[in-house]
Amino acid sequence: MNESQISYDASNLSTNNKKNNNIRKKFKLSLYQLQKLALLGAGSSGEVYLVQDTQSKIKLAQKTVRYTEDEKTKNQLETEVKLSTLLKHENIIRIYATYFLKGKINFVMEYMDRGTLADLLKKIKKIPEKYVGLITYQVVKGMAYCQKEKRIIHRDLKPSNILVNSKGEIKIADFGVSTIVEGSWAQKKTMIGTYIYMAPERIDADIYYINCDVWSLGIIVMECILGFYPYIIYNNNELPNSVWIVHELIENNPVPQLDKNIYSQELIDFTNQCLIKDVKKRPTAAILMNHPFIQKYSNLSCDDLAIWLKTIN
């Protein structure tokens, strides 16, 4: 493949321009047609830009990662490239193209104009239960697809890897540290991911199961509801600064509980199910799809979330 030319599937790209309604499903896109509009974010390994295809006027996100000989980084990049061809679901961020140019790996993907769930939490601290339900329903759908159909463990599910757009759509992103399992478990070779969201078996066991992401989801839901990381109540209201402190907090304390006088029994039971310490008793995402808390919001549309998002600057 020529470095300046890529091919990707544009069949489900959205556009407000009526002239673009008949965009061909497959087309060639010159990299020189991608115009950078803004820097969306930057980290130690690269940047994310808002770009626009100058022909179709479609806005996309372009993640640029500096290529390195570091084995860990190479493995993550290779995993993300591989999974970009496997994952096609309405609640998984769609990567339309990957290419290598001037020492950098680039991912061209759909643009989520409301940023991440972490961005949302920074603005409003905590989210009303109804909207947590609408968000969680979509995340669980994406997780169930990954676990049941693709046998994929994300391994780094957290608010900054859950993306939001103004249409009320929620999508899981960043599968760089994910793994594919043949059965229901994987052998731990390295401790990878963000430790405050890690399931206890990810920290101290030689193997972990496909439902380890469910623990991460439980922590995320609690954080959205409470406005803070739930286990800080056992740590002098401070965020733990090491994986071993997280492990001690989980092992030596009961699972944090939501106030039954404030929150619904469905939500309380949902978080309790997600945060079962015994991995063999913790449900999978597919089982959670039938939980009353998820079913409660399954008939509502993304529009309900979109209307609420309009109230947040």
At which residue positions do the language-model features occur?
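Activation-segment/catalytic-loop signature of the eukaryotic protein kinase fold
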Residues: 98
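AlphaC helix of the protein kinase catalytic domain
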Residues: 118-127
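Conserved short submotifs of the Hanks-type protein kinase catalytic core
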Residues: 103-116
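Conserved N-lobe beta3->alphaC-helix segment of eukaryotic protein kinase catalytic domains
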Residues: 59, 64-87
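Conserved N-lobe ATP-binding subsite of Hanks-type protein kinase domains
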Residues: 47
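Activation segment signature within eukaryotic-like protein kinase domains
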Residues: 135-136
